[in-house]
Curated annotation (Swiss-Prot):
Annotated localization: Periplasm
GO terms for cellular component: cytosol; periplasmic space
Organism: Pectobacterium atrosepticum (strain SCRI 1043 / ATCC BAA-672)
Gene: skp
GO molecular function, one term: unfolded protein binding
Family: Belongs to the Skp family.
Protein name as it appears in the record: Chaperone protein Skp
Region annotation (Lipopolysaccharide binding) ranges: 102-113
Top-level taxonomy: Bacteria, Pseudomonadati, Pseudomonadota, Gammaproteobacteria, Enterobacterales
Broad class of the protein's primary localization: periplasm
Database matches in Pfam families: OmpH
Xref: PANTHER family: CHAPERONE PROTEIN SKP
Protein purpose: Molecular chaperone that interacts specifically with outer membrane proteins, thus maintaining the solubility of early folding intermediates during passage through the periplasm.
Gene Ontology BP terms: chaperone-mediated protein folding; protein stabilization
Amino acid sequence: MKKWLCAAGLGLVLAASASVQAADKIAVVNVSSIFQQLPQRESVGKQLENEFKGRASELQSMENDLQGKMQKLQRDGSTMKASDRSKMEKDVMAQREQFSTKAQAFEQDNRRRQTEERNKILSRIQDAVKAVATKEGYDVVIDANAVAYVANAKDITADVLKQVK
């Protein structure tokens, strides 16, 4: 009786482990490669460049004006009246402060918009991964950059790239 119970238990364990191993169909996808190959990435970059072009040129002209005033102050500061030099120093300090504030706001806005657009593209890639995985019957899809080695997994990067384009 004991032998029969042991044999039945062992058989059950082997059958369960075999079905678990056979149930998972695994695929690998290289999301960063897809992201780099998308033509939308370049068009979004140009769109953002156009969106921030006005503010960038405004900052550039502010910087040039500020540098000109600083050079004039350095060059002519020793020959100016004390009151004029003091007034110009205060003006330069105020303009430098204003430039710094505007530059920080510009950088934050630019970074935020780039992140928004990148996330939109990544969301489209994620939707394409789900569509390909569902269509081809994969249970698990892993990013290729997150895995050191995979022996028995199909690379679906090309299929996902076709789906996104």
